């Protein structure tokens, strides 16, 4: 059934205008974004397919344009629109976390890092620079590519820590493959950076391996 053939109070756009966005289901909100469907599948059904395929709204939040190609009927324009909206949502959530949260627990860091790195298609090494009260000063991406002990320069991390007057740091990198287990190279790099930063009295609190669905704390594994 076409959405235009639904009763007026069941059409997503009319429902939103009459009752507000909170009255709509996740699939209905996505239908408004999609606007049109395919023969035999309306926008509401396509919205539900997106939710089913990617694990709900939380899963969609970590989905990139390439993964959206698996949904029949999503052309380049629609994929770009969805990715843009998801990126705005990630940025809004990241700003809220940055303003409200002290990064004093692994879970607080996990939430922030998954928003920032979880959906990236390429491997990225990043550092959270924290003040003496574990408030975030900055998150900086310092390297892109396969992570090795020689690909990340300790000197660069030390220079940035001093420039930002950081008291401690949290290291992080993503595994686009989805494998969250730290490698031996991850362990060696962590110890190299820990030694370098200790020379300027900056503590390495943790090193996280981030995927779309998981962020693993190396400190909790006794590897920091």
Swiss-Prot record:
Domain MPN: 102-224
Residues that hold Zn(2+) according to the record: 173, 175, 186
Molecular function as annotated in GO: metal ion binding; metallopeptidase activity
Motif interval(s): JAMM motif: 173-186
Gene Ontology biological-process annotations: proteolysis
UniProt keyword annotations, A-Z: Hydrolase, Metal-binding, Metalloprotease, Protease, Zinc
Top-rank taxon, per record: Bacteria
InterPro entries for the chain: MPN (IPR037518), RadC_JAB (IPR025657), RuvA_2-like (IPR010994), UPF0758 (IPR001405), UPF0758_CS (IPR020891), UPF0758_N (IPR046778)
PANTHER family, A to Z: DNA REPAIR PROTEIN RADC (PTHR30471), UPF0758 PROTEIN YEES-RELATED (PTHR30471:SF3)
UniProt family annotation: Belongs to the UPF0758 family.
Protein name, entry field: UPF0758 protein Pnap_3339
Organism for this UniProt entry: Polaromonas naphthalenivorans (strain CJ2)
């Amino acid at each position: 059934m076409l959405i235009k053939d639904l009763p007026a109070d069941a059409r997503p756009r009319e429902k939103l205008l009459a009752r507000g966005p909170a009255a709509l289901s996740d699939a209905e909100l996505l239908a408004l974004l999609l606007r049109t469907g395919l023969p035999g599948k309306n926008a509401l059904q396509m919205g539900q397919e997106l939710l089913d395929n990617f694990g709900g709204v939380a899963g969609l939040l970590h989905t990139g344009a390439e993964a959206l190609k698996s949904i029949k009927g999503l052309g380049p324009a629609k994929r770009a629109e969805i990715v843009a909206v998801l990126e705005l949502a990630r940025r809004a959530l990241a700003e809220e976390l940055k303003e409200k949260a002290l990064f004093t627990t692994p879970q607080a860091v996990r939430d922030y890092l998954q928003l920032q790195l979880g959906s990236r298609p390429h491997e990225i090494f990043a550092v959270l620079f924290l003040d003496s009260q574990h408030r975030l000063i900055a998150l900086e991406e310092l390297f892109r590519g396969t992570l090795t002990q020689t690909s990340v320069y300790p000197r660069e991390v030390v220079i940035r820590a001093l420039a930002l007057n950081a008291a401690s740091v949290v290291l992080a990198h993503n595994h686009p493959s989805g494998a969250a287990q730290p490698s031996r190279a991850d362990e060696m790099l962590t110890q190299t950076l820990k030694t370098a930063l200790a020379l300027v009295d900056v503590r390495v609190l943790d090193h996280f391996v981030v995927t779309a669905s998981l962020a693993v704390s190396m400190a909790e594994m006794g590897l920091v």
